[in-house]
């Protein structure tokens, strides 16, 4: 099976690096799917997006992402996020409270929204 080297890095930490069969990300131009052999591109990630990485061993890795860039080269995908959290790390009740709270600022609300989306996307097949 064809693969592409992929890395997901945020300002705080490197989240993952390895071989993937596909990468899906939400950019300011819309959702994009990257497969091995994709044309090189540079995209800006949305403030409340989700990144899905399908690894070569069949694992689906889902992260909530706030801003940053996606760079696709001939043999590599680099996702450089301002902030990223694995769906498995999300405290759902806290994220729901932040999303629904009237005293939550727009940045925190966007982060909570992307975390809840990531949890939902992780449940999908």
Curated annotation (Swiss-Prot):
Keyword Transport: yes
The protein's role, per its UniProt record: Produces ATP from ADP in the presence of a proton gradient across the membrane.
Keyword Transport appears in the UniProt entry: yes
Annotated NCBIfam families: ATP_synt_epsi (TIGR01216), PRK00571.2-5 (NF001852), PRK13442.1 (NF009977)
Subunit structure: F-type ATPases have 2 components, CF(1) - the catalytic core - and CF(0) - the membrane proton channel. CF(1) has five subunits: alpha(3), beta(3), gamma(1), delta(1), epsilon(1). CF(0) has three main subunits: a, b and c.
HAMAP family per the UniProt record, alphabetical: ATP_synth_epsil_bac
Name of this chain's protein: ATP synthase epsilon chain
Highest taxon listed in the record's lineage: Bacteria
